[in-house]
Amino acid sequence: MILQSPIIHHVDLLLVGGTLRAVATAWKLKQQGFRVFCITPFSYFGEDLCSTLDLFAPKGREYRELFGTGDSLLPMKIKHTLDRKFIDAGIDYLFQTHPVQIVYDRNGIPAGMLVANRSGFQIIAAKVILDATDRSLVLRLAGAPFLPFQPGVYPVDLNVIGEVACRPDLWIHPCEGTVADGGKEYPVVRVTKEIEFRENSPAALARAAVAIRRAVWHPDTVEIADRCRNFAKSAARDRPQRAA
């Protein structure tokens, strides 16, 4: 299939994914005069904290630089602050936009990315593409070699606000803080469940996510994270090579 898509931006750096470290990198490069554009499949930045409800994780240097504090913030504050950082810096971005294919120049050098969203397909021409996706999607699209996946039993973590089911196959780790809503304080816990993986395909990861979400549910559960954290992922080799 041949797609004729418009080139909507020419930039020095295209950021794919909106994790905290990636946002900090893009923001710093913009301050140095580079042209930066960002896309994320989510409807906000800070997806590594907000979509996982990882609110009480240790705060690193990027967190303190972006938010000016080491205190734990609620998702709405995180999203709003990162939005304002990009808007005030003049960084253009698109939410709910997915990487589709690497675009190459006549010499076979990566020159941008074909992306998709509700408006259709567009091309963003870029000298450098920074992959900040959960499963290294850009590297995979570029044909980078990955280490073979080793089937087996892997832990899957899911953060939950409120009560969780008491089951022998669940390990519950209370977080340091609580979340207040409507005058009530709710505990935040990280639940771990071991799940067997025969493969690490998107379908297998989705089945694991459904399994742990069903396992943790309790009538007094307040909120369950949109994403779980699983360790059944293959890593890229140390020196990925672009496919010919």
Question: Where in this protein do the model-derived segments appear?
Answer:
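Glycine-rich Rossmann-fold phosphate-binding loop(s) that bind the pyrophosphate
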Residues: 16-20
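Anionic group-transfer/hydrolysis microenvironments
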Residues: 14, 42, 133
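Flavin (FAD/FMN)-binding glycine-rich loop and adjacent Rossmann-like elements that form
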Residues: 1-7, 48, 60-64, 94-95, ...
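Conserved N-terminal/central alpha/beta ligand/cofactor-binding core
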Residues: 2-10, 24, 28-108, 140, ...
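Structural motif
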Residues: 12-13, 128
